[in-house]
A protein has these predicted regions:
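Short, conserved catalytic or adaptor-binding loops enriched in Gly and charged residues
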Residues: 17-20, 98
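A structural supersecondary motif
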Residues: 19-29
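Single conserved hydrophobic/aromatic residue that forms the stacking wall/gate
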Residues: 1-7, 11
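Short Gly/Pro-enriched turn/cap motifs at secondary-structure boundaries
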Residues: 8, 32-34
Length: 131
């Protein structure tokens, strides 16, 4: 099985939604040997130091504040195929969180590009139907 890099501007779209992160994100998407699942190698520059455990916990806490299935953090040792038909827009693999010198953090984020997107469109449709 092979994987290849994929063109993605997901992190740029995140900057539009979260403008205070502008200039702090850089990412590379990777197509993995499944039909729909991709992985994003996300690099973030922090203003202050933190451990990988603190970062993962902050992400878990943030996931609780967001609408359901937008963000997840997985502590399980999973493979790309395990994320097929996962409704979450992004799942951080906590086992791969790394902290480098100068407060540089690397995250591995999995997402089912088709299924999660379809789920968010359903969320929007439900929201609009209640207005």
């Amino acid at each position: 099985h092979r994987y290849s890099s994929a063109a993605s501007d997901v992190y740029k779209r995140q900057e539009r939604i979260l403008p205070h992160l502008q200039g702090l994100l850089e990412a590379q998407a990777i197509r993995v040997p499944t039909v729909n699942v991709s992985a994003m190698d996300l690099t973030v520059s922090l203003k202050r130091s933190a451990t990988s455990e603190q970062i993962n916990q902050a992400l878990r806490d943030s996931a609780k504040e967001l609408p359901p299935n937008v963000l997840g953090v997985s502590d399980e040792l999973l493979a790309s195929c395990d994320y097929n038909h996962d409704p979450r827009s992004a799942v951080v693999d906590s086992n791969q969180t790394r902290v480098a010198p100068n407060n540089l953090v690397k995250l591995l984020v999995w997402f089912d590009n088709e299924w999660a997107y379809a789920n968010r469109m359903l969320d929007v449709a439900q929201l609009m139907s209640h207005q």
